[in-house]
C-alpha cells in the first residue's frame, strides 16, 4: 500500500520531486503493517530528491491533529492509515497544514469526505475483506499443521481520486465504507 501511495505521488509530479519535502504520519508506528507501508513508500520515492522533514509515528488519536499542526511546513503529508488520513484531512480542511497536500491510506467515509472536499489529493483504499479472509485462511492452515509457516500476502487496493470518487467502479467501495 505504501508503494501504491508513492506511485500516485510520482505520477502527479511526473517523477520529479526534487526540492519537495514531506512528513509521514501513522497512528501506530510500531505495527508490522505500518513498517511495511513506510518501507514501501520510501522505496518508491527514495531516489527522487524528496526530503523527509519529519515523521509522526504512534501518536494518540485525540492529540494527532495538534501534533500535525505543530510540525514544520512540508509540501506533502503522507498518512499511512485511516486514522492518520482523517487527522491530516481535518487539518488540511481547516487550513492548518500550511498548504501541504495529503496523500493517504484509508477506508472510512470520513477519509472519502476529505478526498471529495479537496482536503486530500489521493486515497489508497485497502481491500479489508480480502485482508481478513487471507488472515483467517492462514490461521486455519496454521492450526491444521504445526509446521505451517505463515506467508505474507499482498492485499489488493483501489486508488481513488476526487474525479473518480463517485464512478461506477467505486460505488461498491463507498457503499462498504458506509456500513
Where are these regions (language model features)?
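Short beta-strand elements in bilobed, periplasmic/extracellular small-molecule ligand-binding domains
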Residues: 21-24, 42-62
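Glycine-enriched alpha-helix->loop->beta-strand junction motifs that scaffold or abut catalytic
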Residues: 97, 117-121
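Hydrophobic alpha-helical segments within soluble ligand-binding/sensing domains
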Residues: 1-20, 64, 107-111, 126-146
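Extracytoplasmic ligand-binding site segments that recognize negatively charged/polar headgroups
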Residues: 3, 23-41
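Hinge/cleft segment of the Venus flytrap/periplasmic-binding protein
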Residues: 130-179
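Paired acidic/hydrophobic, glycine-rich loop segments that form the ligand-binding mouth/hinge
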Residues: 78, 122-124
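Class I S-adenosyl-L-methionine
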Residues: 3, 10, 39-42, 46, ...
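Hydrophobic alpha-helical
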Residues: 41, 56-112
Amino acid at each position: 500500500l505504501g508503494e501504491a501511495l508513492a506511485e500516485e505521488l510520482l505520477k502527479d509530479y511526473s517523477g520529479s520531486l526534487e526540492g519537495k519535502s514531506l512528513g509521514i504520519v501513522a497512528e501506530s508506528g510500531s505495527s508490522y503493517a505500518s513498517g511495511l507501508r513506510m518501507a514501501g513508500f520510501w522505496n518508491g520515492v527514495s531516489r527522487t530528491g524528496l526530503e523527509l522533514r519529519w515523521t509522526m509515528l504512534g501518536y494518540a488519536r485525540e492529540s494527532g491533529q495538534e501534533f500535525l499542526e505543530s510540525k514544520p511546513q512540508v509540501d506533502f503529508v503522507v498518512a499511512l492509515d485511516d486514522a492518520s488520513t482523517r487527522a491530516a484531512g481535518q487539518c488540511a480542511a481547516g487550513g492548518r497544514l500550511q498548504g501541504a497536500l495529503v496523500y493517504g491510506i484509508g477506508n472510512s467515509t470520513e477519509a472519502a469526505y476529505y478526498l471529495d472536499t479537496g482536503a486530500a489529493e489521493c486515497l489508497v483504499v485497502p481491500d479489508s475483506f480480502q485482508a481478513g479472509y487471507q488472515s483467517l485462511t492462514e490461521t486455519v492452515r496454521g492450526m491444521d499443521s504445526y509446521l505451517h509457516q505463515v506467508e505474507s500476502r499482498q492485499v489488493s487496493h483501489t486508488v481513488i481520486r476526487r474525479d473518480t470518487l463517485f464512478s461506477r467502479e467505486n460505488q461498491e467501495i463507498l457503499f462498504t465504507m458506509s456500513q
